[in-house]
């Protein structure tokens, strides 16, 4: 009997061990992979997907009409190693009948932990304090030296009370937060009850919060949501944290708000673009802490994500139910 033709799978970069092992054990697939941790150049990506039945990509890989055309009619499954899907041309993908897998849920805890870490790092001015120790600035003591802001008796505003937003609130509550506010597309009374969180207009959230954490999805409605008008409503003692997507924030307006003292400080795990150029004005500010999009970066989480992404891909190729399929 003639052996069945193998299905071509293209992977846009090295995977953690669990996902790599799942693909290696797939006897019905022929796996090709870009073997560098650096982002795959566009030309190599377009060449790599030619004739592929499945594509396993990253958040940094733009899957648009041109790439889909390059892949051709064989492409039936795209699995992304992310919960975000704003890098995927979903309308075009749906038009072609291609299934999409993603990795929600598994990164919630790690991302919430990072959000709280970033908030504490920013509000207590830890990078500044570390630098003072290193450069000899720790020469004496005075009552207000290196003072920051505490969470006890504070008001925390969360933009987007989804899985990650709830996990952040759950971790902040034991710090003695007095009041939680949230905003989003619609009230979520069942989820909000755990924190006695109040659903309010975004202008009220900006004006009344001591700490603001942005954890919403990037959509046409949230693009540029946090801009000049938003920052002008914030307290000058307020801390702004973004762990969602860079495009939710107008970074020029944020820079002006920070540089002028309109708001106290900001912590960002996401920027536009990524990576952020070392010459970017935000990096000149002591009151702005920027991380390289490491929200889900724990060994356990990344391994779990890679296994889920691999299983999504394989199930889709075999015509089976995906563990986590995006409904288009």
Swiss-Prot record:
Reaction catalysis annotation: glycolate + NADP(+) = glyoxylate + NADPH + H(+); (R)-glycerate + NAD(+) = 3-hydroxypyruvate + NADH + H(+); (R)-glycerate + NADP(+) = 3-hydroxypyruvate + NADPH + H(+)
One GO CC annotation: cytoplasm
Keyword NADP in record: yes
Modified sites of kind Phosphoserine: 36
Keyword Oxidoreductase: yes
Single Gene Ontology MF annotation: NADPH binding
Gene Ontology BP terms: dicarboxylic acid metabolic process; glyoxylate metabolic process
Top enzyme category: oxidoreductase
Active-site residue numbers: 293
Site (Raises pKa of active site His): 274
EC number(s) given by UniProt: 1.1.1.79, 1.1.1.81
Annotated residues for binding of substrate: 83-84, 245, 269, 293-296
Similarity-based family: Belongs to the D-isomer specific 2-hydroxyacid dehydrogenase family.
Subunit and interaction comment: Homodimer.
Name of the protein described by the UniProt record: Glyoxylate reductase/hydroxypyruvate reductase
Source organism per UniProt: Mus musculus (Mouse)
Name of the gene this protein is made from: Grhpr
């Amino acid at each position: 009997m003639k052996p069945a033709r193998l299905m071509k799978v293209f992977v846009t970069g090295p995977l953690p061990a669990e996902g790599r092992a799942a693909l290696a054990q797939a006897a019905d697939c022929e796996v090709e992979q870009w073997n560098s941790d650096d982002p795959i150049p566009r030309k190599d990506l377009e060449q790599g997907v030619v004739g592929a039945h499945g594509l396993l990509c990253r958040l940094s890989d733009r899957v648009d009409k041109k790439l889909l055309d390059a892949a051709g009619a064989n492409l039936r499954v795209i699995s992304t190693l992310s919960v975000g899907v704003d890098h995927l041309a979903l309308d075009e993908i749906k038009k072609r009948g291609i299934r999409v897998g993603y990795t929600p849920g598994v990164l919630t805890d790690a991302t919430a932990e990072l959000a709280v870490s970033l908030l504490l790092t920013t509000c207590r001015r830890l990078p500044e304090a570390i630098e003072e120790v290193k450069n000899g600035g720790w020469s004496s003591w005075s009552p207000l030296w290196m003072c920051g802001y505490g969470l006890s008796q504070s008001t925390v505003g969360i933009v987007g009370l989804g899985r990650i937003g709830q996990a952040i609130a759950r971790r902040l509550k034991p710090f003695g937060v007095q009041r939680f506010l949230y905003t989003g597309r619609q009230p979520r009374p069942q989820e909000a009850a755990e924190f006695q969180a109040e659903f309010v207009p975004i202008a009220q959230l900006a004006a009344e919060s001591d700490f603001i954490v942005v954890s919403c999805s990037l959509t046409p409605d949230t693009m540029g949501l946090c801009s000049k008008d938003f920052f002008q409503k914030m307290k000058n003692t307020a801390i702004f944290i973004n762990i969602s997507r860079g495009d939710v924030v107008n970074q020029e307006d944020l820079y002006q708000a920070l540089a002028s003292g309109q708001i106290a400080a900001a912590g960002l795990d996401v920027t536009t673009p990524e990576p952020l150029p070392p010459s970017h004005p935000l990096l000149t500010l002591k009151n702005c802490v920027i991380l390289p999009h490491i929200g889900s970066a724990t060994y356990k989480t990344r391994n779990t994500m890679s296994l889920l992404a691999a299983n999504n891909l394989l199930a889709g190729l075999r015509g089976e139910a995906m563990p986590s399929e995006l409904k288009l």
